[in-house]
Amino acid sequence: MIMKRTILLCLPTILLLVACHQNTNQANTTKNSSTVISTTSSQSTSTTSEQSTSSSTSAETNQEATSTETQVNFNGSYYSVQGKYGEVIIANKKHPLAADYAPGENPEALAAFQRLIADMQALGFGISNNYSGFRSYETQANLYQSYVNQEGQAAADTYSARAGYSEHQTGLAFDLLDTSGNLLEEPNASQWLATNAHLYGFIVRYLPGKESSTGYMAESWHVRYIGQEATDIYNSGLTLEEYFGVPGGDY
């Protein structure tokens, strides 16, 4: 009887110890779970950081690729770059033409130019059938010297090319004239030309505010034949130099 009472008296103590042991295990389990969650969170943060670094590196790589300049080639007569649809001749103050390079007017460019003139005339613009197209090295030398004699070299260099540096020598450039024989400057006709020249494969070569790129003052009358890629250049709003990433500006 005494033993039974002793057991009964000890039973609450035993149950209390068991309960404490269970609580301790649960606490340890919770602590371990928290540790796992914390570790997983840390790993996730590390992964996110790595992904961010990877994205940053990728962006820097793309930026470097975009800023890469186009390779300019020289074949002994002229400089050129490879465009989307073929070779594009570059003639500016940094890229001269050989003195003996005399291709005449490019047949494809001339045909497109004549269509351009005909369409402008049909729309009522006062455009002459006469124009200024191909010029030989010698012709350009005489023309440039006449401007130098009149206004000095510094002034002449802002609007006339020295011999060997003129786009007219490529046979791909044309100056439009009005019916009075003057270079085309009439605002409505000039605006139409600037907006629509690319549909005929041309770009208005010397744009306003782009003297530091092209090397010349704006010329609303001077168009340069490019072909199909003229539309890409027009839509970009860039000069030929800026579009292809080639050096331009002054001599």
Language model features with spans:
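Extracytoplasmic cell-surface/polysaccharide-interacting catalytic and binding patches
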Residues: H21-Y251
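C-terminal motif of bacterial Sec signal peptides marking the signal peptidase cleavage site
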Residues: L16-A19
